[in-house]
Structures are given as C-alpha cells and as structure tokens.
Design a protein with these regions (language model features):
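Short glycine/proline-centered loop/turn elements that form peptide/ligand docking sites
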Residues: 111, 115, 137-140, 157-162
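Conserved acetyl-CoA-binding loop-helix of GNAT-fold acetyltransferases
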Residues: 98, 107-120, 124, 145-146
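Short acidic N-proximal helix/loop "leader" segments that mark the beginning
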Residues: 1-8
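Hydrophobic adenine-recognition pocket in adenosine-nucleotide-binding enzymes
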Residues: 16, 99-101, 134
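A short beta-loop-alpha structural element at the N-terminal edge
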Residues: 11-26
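Conserved acetyl-CoA-binding loop of GNAT-fold acetyltransferases
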Residues: 145-155
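Conserved GNAT acetyl-CoA-binding A-motif
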Residues: 122-135
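Acetyl-CoA-dependent GNAT
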Residues: 32-34, 41-93, 98-102
Length: 166
C-alpha cells in the first residue's frame, strides 16, 4: 500500500500501521448503529460471523485498505475496505467500506475527511466503485448521499449504497 498522509485542521489521515489492526475491532463496535437513547449493544455482538468478517485477518488480503484519523496523538477513527460478502455486498469485484469514529470525535468533519481520503485512494488505485450499508434510520444515510453515494437497494432496513469512483 502506498504511503498516504494528509493533515487538515489538526487531523492527520494516514494508513493504519502494523500492530494497530486491533483498533478495527474497536471501530467495528463503534460502527454498530443504535438509535439515540438506546442502551449500548453488548460487545459480544462482535463475535457474530457476519460482523467478524469485517475485521478478521484484516491486512492479509492484498486489497484490504485502511486509513486512520489521528487527533491529538490518538487514533480517533478509521475507514476500511475489503472485498467480502458483508451487509453492503453488491458483487465480488466491489470492495465494501466501513467507517467509524469514537463518539467524542463525531460531528467535527473527521468522518468526511476519512471518507474522501479513502475514495481518493481507491480512485488512484483504479477502483471504479465501493459499496456500503447503513441502517435507514441512521443519520449517516443522508451524509453518504450528500457525499455522492447512490442508493442501490434496501434489504431488511439496511440501505445498500454505492460510491462510484470513475
């Protein structure tokens, strides 16, 4: 993976480093959406095979990609893609995207920086599209649409979107 780094407003976007893969499990937990006021989801949900595939052995496949946002010396969030049969699967050639931030870093534009950086990285590598899924009630659904993603399908309350990169 080429070295890629950007700094905007005190936020550094860089590739996830060797030894930081454990953070993806933390961010996967943060990516599990729950309505405002709902109790926290038990961490045991991360043992479900449908979720484990988002992080298990991440980095072993040649096309696994992850960018981290660093604020004040701490990894505040991450965006990662891999080809898999996840909630947002559209075809075997399209990688699926996941993104999450720790709660205290949300609403500051860091997610937008991460998403745009990953889309640009994929574009540079010749990828033509990336998919994702988001629950219909999640505020992030409107954000993805504003960022140029297109609604492709709805499956059991999950919106499947595609961001075209060509």
């Amino acid at each position: 993976m080429p070295t890629w780094s950007s700094m905007t407003g005190g936020v550094t976007i860089r590739p996830l480093r060797t030894g930081e893969q454990w953070l993806l499990t933390e961010f996967l937990y943060e990516a599990v959406w729950r309505p405002d006021g709902a109790p926290p989801v038990p961490r045991t949900v991360l043992q479900e095979p449908v979720l484990r595939r988002y992080v298990e052995e991440f980095g072993r496949a040649a096309d696994d990609r992850c960018l981290a946002a660093v604020c004040d010396g701490r990894v505040a969030g991450a965006v990662w893609v891999r080809r898999m049969h996840g909630f947002g699967h559209v075809d075997d050639a399209t990688p699926e995207l996941a993104i999450a931030l720790y709660p205290e870093y949300r609403g500051r534009g860091i997610g937008t920086l991460l998403l745009r950086a990953m889309l640009e990285l994929l574009r540079q590598e010749g990828c033509t599209q990336v998919s994702l899924s988001v629950q219909r009630e999640n505020r992030a659904a409107a954000w993805y649409l504003r960022e140029g993603c297109e609604l492709l399908a709805e499956r059991d309350g999950e919106l499947v979107m595609v961001c075209r990169l060509d």
